[in-house]
């Protein structure tokens, strides 16, 4: 009887199964909303508030400007990372992660911070901005310095200097070899470009390397036969440097 779609009992069982599925989905969503690794948006805001961490403003909006300037808030990924650093900020000994947390909390315009100690009692904190090529303004450096040198945040024995990270701009000249027979070359190239941006944007950090293998792997989207990077040399920034892709070009070679 249940094999018949017209059987009322079959419809009743399907309805009950669907209701159960919705219930389990709701339970799963509520569960992940209480996990830092998976919580998003307002759920993440409420979760990290338990650690006295709040979402920062990256760019102040101005509706009176022409054109209007939108308000840009800290991303979920950045807030999640900073919230995890908050535990290190509880230390009064001045560990590296505590300096990173305080520097990034000073202003939402700080994308990354890297502290180093060139000599005993001296701490250099390099700052990378979230806007432009990453070079911080003098105002941003001053704001971070004032925040970091507060006696309630850093050890009195530390002499803190806030400096701008050195930005290493680079360009990418990419050749994608795509078979003539197959999906649209434009579709394949668009997917390769999307995958490229997914790997170069997160690597816009202080001291993070940009190797050839990473780029080629990302560009090998389905349908790409071969990838060539013209005149490429791996970029290995020091602890005070950050790589930044200023421009990239993608050439299609249909074969």
Across the structure, where does each feature detected by a protein language model lie?
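N-terminal polar alpha-helical/low-complexity "assembly arms" that mediate subunit docking
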Residues: 1-92, 185-255
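Carbohydrate-recognition loop of C-type lectin domains
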Residues: 88-208
């Amino acid at each position: 009887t249940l094999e018949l779609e017209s059987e009322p009992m079959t419809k009743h069982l399907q309805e009950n199964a669907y209701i159960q599925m919705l219930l389990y989905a709701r339970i799963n969503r509520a569960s992940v909303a209480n996990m830092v690794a998976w919580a998003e948006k307002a759920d993440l805001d409420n979760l990290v508030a338990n650690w006295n961490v709040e979402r920062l403003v990256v760019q102040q909006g101005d509706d009176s400007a022409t054109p209007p300037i939108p308000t840009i808030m800290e991303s979920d990924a950045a807030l999640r990372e900073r919230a995890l650093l908050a535990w290190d900020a509880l230390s009064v000994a001045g560990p590296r992660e505590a300096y990173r947390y305080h520097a990034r909390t000073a202003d939402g315009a700080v994308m990354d911070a890297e502290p180093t100690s060139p000599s005993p009692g001296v701490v250099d904190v390099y700052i990378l901005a979230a806007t432009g090529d990453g070079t911080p303004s003098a105002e941003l450096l001053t704001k971070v310095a004032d925040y970091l040198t507060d006696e309630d945040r850093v050890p009195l024995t530390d002499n803190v200097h806030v400096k701008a990270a050195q930005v290493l701009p680079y360009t990418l000249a990419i050749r994608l070899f795509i078979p003539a027979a197959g999906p649209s070359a434009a579709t394949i190239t668009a997917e390769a470009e999307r995958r490229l941006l997914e790997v170069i944007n997160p690597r816009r950090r202080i001291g993070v390397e940009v190797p050839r293998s990473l780029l080629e792997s990302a560009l090998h989207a389905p349908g790409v036969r071969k990838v060539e990077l013209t005149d490429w040399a791996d970029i290995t920034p020091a602890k005070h440097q950050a790589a930044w892709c200023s421009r990239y070009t993608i050439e299609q070679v249909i074969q």
